[in-house]
């Protein structure tokens, strides 16, 4: 059965490209995993799949099993101990894993995109998964319509769905940046959710200033507060804002995240020139060194409270 074992489905939407929707999807997934939840990421941005690059698994390949395609594992679950917190597993599925060459352009018409999305929703074996995050392309295109139609036939928006053993379309998280041009496009995305009867869980304002890696002071690169103003006007929950995190950028670029004090920066730079350090920890553990981890930890806790607090199965 499609989506068998998936409890909650959360769409990550943006009305405009370049707002960091895929990075928000990944950080939400990592934060939910660090709350002990098993998480999957379904990347349906068919013409610009970013998830394989962000998780550092561009060369991974999808395997076929009797139950369907097997998602690529990013990290496994970890049981709690006296020194560690519980950690859920993270797996991902993307068209990027199916391309023969990662530089291949995907030039498809609407019907082929629609068929691919339906196949992703019906032929991927996720197994037991607490949260499936769907990274969507920007705007409201054929992909969004196909996704909404298919999900509303495979899952229910009823909070009691998980108690009945069904997948629940919990809702959508909208991602914007502070500028008016971005928030105006996200308003259209919110309208799309209303028309398709998909609940909106909240708004995240990404790139809300620049966080200095030395002192932590946040400077506004663009205008500020646009996401919150829009959320208030639309009556949508504002989850919070996230400044640009240089350390997260280094993390997804495969560099070692340096959380040392700024006074040691010069010496560390000289040492790195002599010998490039290697960090063998899983991505999720290295993410803890990023400034944005604490912010997304709060987002994850809020979403869990919203979604599971509304479900009879949560007790």
Curated annotation (Swiss-Prot):
What is its cofactor? [4Fe-4S] cluster
Question: What ranges does the record give for the region Disordered, renumbered to this chain?
Answer: 256-283
* UniProt family annotation: Belongs to the Mrp/NBP35 ATP-binding proteins family. NUBP2/CFD1 subfamily.
Gene Ontology BP terms: iron-sulfur cluster assembly; tRNA wobble uridine modification
Sites where the protein binds ATP: 15-22
Q: Which PANTHER family match?
A: CYTOSOLIC FE-S CLUSTER ASSEMBLY FACTOR NUBP2 (PTHR23264:SF19), NUCLEOTIDE-BINDING PROTEIN NBP35 YEAST -RELATED (PTHR23264)
**Gene Ontology terms for molecular function:** 4 iron, 4 sulfur cluster binding; ATP binding; ATP hydrolysis activity; ATP-dependent FeS chaperone activity; metal ion binding
The entry's function note states:
Component of the cytosolic iron-sulfur (Fe/S) protein assembly (CIA) machinery. Required for maturation of extramitochondrial Fe-S proteins. The nbp35-cfd1 heterotetramer forms a Fe-S scaffold complex, mediating the de novo assembly of an Fe-S cluster and its transfer to target apoproteins.
User: Lineage of the source organism?
Assistant: Eukaryota, Fungi, Dikarya, Ascomycota, Pezizomycotina
Q: Binding residues for [4Fe-4S] cluster, per the UniProt record?
A: 212, 215
Q: Which gene encodes it?
A: cfd1
Q: Which SUPFAM superfamilies match?
A: P-loop containing nucleoside triphosphate hydrolases
Where does the chain cross the membrane? none
Q: Which Pfam families match?
A: ParA (PF10609)
Q: How does it assemble?
A: Heterotetramer of 2 nbp35 and 2 cfd1 chains.
The main location class comes to cytoplasm
> Where found in the cell?
Cytoplasm
CDD domains this protein is in? Mrp_NBP35
Q: What is this protein called?
A: Cytosolic Fe-S cluster assembly factor cfd1
| GO CC terms | cytosolic [4Fe-4S] assembly scaffold complex
**Keyword field:** 4Fe-4S, ATP-binding, Cytoplasm, Iron, Iron-sulfur, Metal-binding, Nucleotide-binding
Q: How many cofactor units bind, and how?
A: Binds 4 [4Fe-4S] clusters per heterotetramer. Contains two stable clusters in the N-termini of nbp35 and two labile, bridging clusters between subunits of the nbp35-cfd1 heterotetramer.
């Amino acid at each position: 059965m499609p989506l068998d074992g998936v409890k909650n489905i959360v769409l990550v939407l943006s009305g405009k490209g370049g707002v960091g929707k895929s990075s928000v999807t990944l950080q939400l997934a990592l934060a939910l995993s660090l709350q002990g939840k098993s998480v999957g990421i379904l990347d349906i941005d068919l013409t610009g799949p970013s998830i394989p690059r962000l998780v550092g698994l561009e060369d991974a390949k999808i395997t076929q099993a009797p139950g369907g395609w097997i998602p690529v594992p990013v990290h496994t679950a970890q049981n709690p101990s006296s020194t560690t917190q519980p950690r859920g597993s993270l797996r991902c599925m993307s068209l990027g894993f199916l391309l023969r060459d990662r530089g291949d352009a995907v030039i498809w018409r609407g019907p082929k995109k629609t068929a691919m999305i339906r196949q992703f929703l019906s032929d991927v074996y996720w197994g037991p998964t607490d949260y499936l995050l769907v990274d969507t392309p920007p705007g409201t295109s054929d992909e969004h319509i196909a996704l909404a139609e298919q999900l509303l036939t495979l899952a229910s928006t009823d909070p009691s769905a998980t108690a009945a053993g069904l997948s629940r379309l919990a809702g959508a998280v909208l991602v914007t940046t502070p500028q008016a041009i971005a928030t105006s496009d996200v308003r259209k995305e919110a309208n799309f959710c209303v028309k398709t009867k998909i609940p909106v869980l909240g708004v995240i304002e990404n790139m809300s200033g620049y966080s200095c890696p030395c002192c932590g002071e946040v400077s506004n690169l663009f205008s500020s507060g646009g996401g919150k103003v829009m959320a208030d006007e639309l009556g949508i929950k504002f989850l919070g804002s996230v400044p640009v995190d240089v350390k997260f950028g280094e993390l997804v670029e495969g560099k070692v995240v340096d959380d040392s004090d700024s006074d040691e920066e010069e010496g560390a730079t000289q040492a790195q020139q002599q010998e490039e350090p290697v960090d063998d920890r899983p991505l999720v553990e290295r993410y803890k060194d990023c400034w944005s981890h604490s912010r997304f930890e709060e987002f994850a806790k809020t979403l869990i409270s919203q979604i599971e607090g509304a479900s009879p199965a949560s007790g």
